[in-house]
Amino acid sequence: MCIRDSVITTNTYAIVPFHIGEDRYEDQGGALLELAAKLARDAADSVPREVQVAASVPPMFGSYLPEQFEVQGARRMMLQFRRYLAPVADIFVGETLGSVAEATTYLDVFSDCAADLWLSVTLEDRDPVDGAPRLRSGEPLSELLLSIEGMRFDALLFNCSQPEVMNDAVCISRAELEAFTAQHGAARPMIGAYANAFPLMDEEYEASNASVHQLRQDITPEAYLRYAEQWVESGAEIIGGCCGITPGHIELLANSLKKAPVTMPDYA
């Protein structure tokens, strides 16, 4: 498992106009980012062991809505995230990114930051094809892997998708990244997964923050552990939980896997 024992994420996922509105974002966005950074750093420093802070960089135009992505507007907002979160960040993690354009824009904006750089994408899980994972945009994972070859990232993760679709993505990414890094004499980026416990979203659910979602009752801590063990067997070094994965799930992961996983809750 990963060398890091504990990671918390900043509570910054919702500090974008999609969630808080354009006016509030313009008036208070910077102050909210600064406050979230302070709270996360204070929490990490309050315990007698090393806890790293991962600065959460969300989709700039809403979760599961890659068609709304616009490069220049995204860059402007991402630069604000970088400005306010860099002082506390051990890691930057772009989370729930749903298209090649979202992913490559994020990597470009944060390419020269001092913190580790993690890229986490969300996978299409409504109509998956075995052995051919796709991003929420419908673009093949293979296209993303080709597009980010040569770009800087320290970990590639998959999040906020059903656990059933994660293993194919882990397997394919491991093979492709190992082939590329071996050819260039570089170390392979880490690979990880942190799934959600949502039921399948239909097309009407695409405004994923318009309501409170029900959770799957079958994703118990024990069931989630079985998925996680499969991901580890396939080469994942970072394991955590996204929406609907509780502290109880994470506790069982930490106690059951050989080393404590990196845990990725959606809040600090």
Question: Where does each model-flagged region fall?
Answer:
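Domain-level signal for soluble alpha/beta catalytic cores
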Residues: 4-268
